Amino acid sequence: MDAAAWDKKYEETELVWGAPPNELLVEYATALPHGQALDLACGEGRNALWLATRGWEVTGIDYSAVAIEKARTIAARSPRSVLDRLDYRCGDVTVAEYASRNGQGYDLALLLYLHLPAPQRTLVVNRAINSLKPDGIPMILGHDRSNIDYGVGGPKDPEILYTPEELMQEFQGRLEFEIAGNPHRHTETGIAVDALVIGRKSGVGNAKNG
């Protein structure tokens, strides 16, 4: 889908993905000390807003100008202290500037349900890793390729889906993996099969802008 198609999707529904944050993000990040976070394909900002309410400073980037405007409108209902921690930007995550607000890199990068052809996915994940501080955490979550046959919802094009094993093989050496698997998600129409990888940036050195 191009930006115009995403704009149309966000215009037609009040909240495309709902208001609550992603359950796996909440489960994992609740125990983390707050810092700088990057949310790629942030949509209407449900995850970015949740992080900001917990003290994180969050940069959210999305292709859809409509989604970003909705994210800003929703955030405006929050206390000033929360609103000031949010920086929403409209842009294509394959080329957009990732620089953190303090210029020192991110502690956490979210790539949640960001489905791209493999070459673009590799580019974006590498850029996200580059933007992290040493020991920073990328969280990659999406529809597993097996969901086409064994789950419900999500894209039906296998070229934009992936498995945890593929991600681990591709990014070994760049990440030290903490969690990898296929969580099952209950939906109104059945069970969806997801792919989840969480790791830490390997090696030392300064974070880059991506």
Region locations from a protein language model:
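Conserved beta-strand signature within the Rossmann-like core of class I S-adenosyl-L-methionine
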Residues: 135-143
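Conserved SAM-binding strand-loop segment of SAM-dependent methyltransferases
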Residues: 80-94
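A short acidic, Gly/Pro-enriched loop at the edge of an enzyme's catalytic core
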Residues: 98-108
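Conserved class I S-adenosyl-L-methionine
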Residues: 1-32
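A short SAM/SAH-binding and catalytic strip from SAM-dependent methyltransferases
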Residues: 106-121
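Conserved SAM/SAH-binding beta-strand->alpha-helix loop
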Residues: 64-66
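Conserved SAM-binding motif I beta-strand of class I
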Residues: 57-62
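A short glycine-rich, Lys/Arg-flanked "PGG" loop and its adjoining helix->strand segment in the class I
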Residues: 122-134
